[in-house]
């Protein structure tokens, strides 16, 4: 006779496997509980714990740095970098909020709506920074820059793909957007801005906004990867060689577009403390990481020595995400209105 304990384990495992086999992330679920994908709610908590608004930061010294301290060549790099960041931030705020329309499950909605709110905060922050740096007029014309326009086109293509009624094609667009836009596209610009503070001790307020933004974008990208892995588990036949080649092709195209942005940013000269070649390898590494997160092989060769010189960035951005979800900063102030210095915050 089989012991009752073993039988209980057997039937419990059978039940769980049956439930897993019948999961469908695209199938509407009316009831809130029980959760089918409870692990996803950690991303909602992560954004809540990272909550910030731009009025928390003091930019008085940044204005002085931008107008007086830095060279004209550096000012041009900063200006273009900020314009490139802001252009993306004003275009992506609807993506996450629409996720629930195609995956009508409570966990997806909770995370998606939380992410959408964070994108609005990002947009507000960079709109304010453009005003502070006197770049509002230039922002009106930034879409005329060929490199920026090229990125707008492939971003629009990804977003347009989310309107597809075909679940497989929709999955492709979610993958491309979350892993190549959210997880890569802005990060070379984040690296540039934060390096000014690290190497020259300037632009402290802006650097803190960029760091806060990049931590949240990292969470967005990781959530996207987890969604793709769930879909892959539920629909393995979608991820055939043709589908993977399509992703690889899009990845190469996205890399070329990002290189075009860098060429524009550095057209008047490079930074001595952050060579353009180093940033190229930084971007390649992030693309590789995105592919590996969904079980695909990396496609770019990277120079590990060049990556070592910027590993401080990954430590800053990802060092706390697995543990305390951004309990790095103080909360003993009025978040809605009080402007504080970097020493107060960190």
Write out the residue ranges for each language-model feature:
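Non-heme di-metal
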Residues: 21-346
């Amino acid at each position: 006779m089989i012991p009752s304990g073993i039988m209980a384990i057997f039937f419990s495992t059978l039940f769980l496997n049956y439930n897993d086999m019948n999961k469908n992330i695209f199938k509407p679920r009316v009831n809130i509980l029980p959760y089918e994908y409870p692990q996803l709610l950690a991303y909602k908590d992560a954004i809540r714990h990272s909550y910030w608004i731009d009025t928390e930061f003091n930019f008085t010294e940044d204005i002085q740095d931008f107008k007086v301290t830095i060279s004209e060549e550096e000012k041009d790099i900063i200006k273009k970098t900020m314009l490139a960041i802001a252009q993306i931030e004003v275009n992506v705020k609807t993506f996450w909020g629409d996720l629930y329309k195609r995956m009508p499950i409570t966990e997806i909605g909770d995370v998606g709506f939380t992410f959408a709110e964070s994108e609005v905060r990002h947009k507000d922050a960079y709109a304010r920074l453009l005003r502070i740096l006197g770049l509002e007029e230039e922002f009106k014309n930034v879409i005329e820059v060929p490199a920026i326009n090229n990125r707008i086109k492939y971003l629009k293509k990804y977003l347009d793909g989310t309107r597809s009624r075909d679940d497989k094609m929709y999955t492709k667009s979610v993958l491309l957007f979350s892993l190549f836009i959210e997880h890569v596209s802005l990060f070379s610009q984040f690296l540039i801005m934060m390096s000014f503070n690290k190497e020259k001790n300037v632009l402290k307020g802006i650097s803190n906004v960029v760091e806060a933004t990049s931590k949240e974008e990292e969470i967005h990208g990781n959530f996207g990867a987890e969604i793709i892995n769930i879909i892959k588990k539920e629909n393995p036949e979608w991820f055939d060689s043709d589908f993977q080649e399509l992703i690889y092709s899009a990845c190469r195209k996205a890399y070329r577009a990002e290189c075009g942005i860098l060429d524009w940013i550095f057209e008047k000269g490079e930074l001595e403390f952050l060579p353009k070649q180093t940033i190229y390898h930084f971007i390649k590494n992030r693309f590789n990481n995105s592919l590996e997160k969904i079980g695909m092989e990396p496609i770019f060769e990277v120079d590990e020595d060049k990556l070592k010189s910027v590993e401080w960035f990954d430590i800053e951005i990802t060092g706390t995400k697995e543990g305390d979800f951004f309990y790095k900063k103080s909360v003993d102030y009025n978040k809605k209105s009080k402007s504080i210095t970097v020493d107060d915050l960190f």
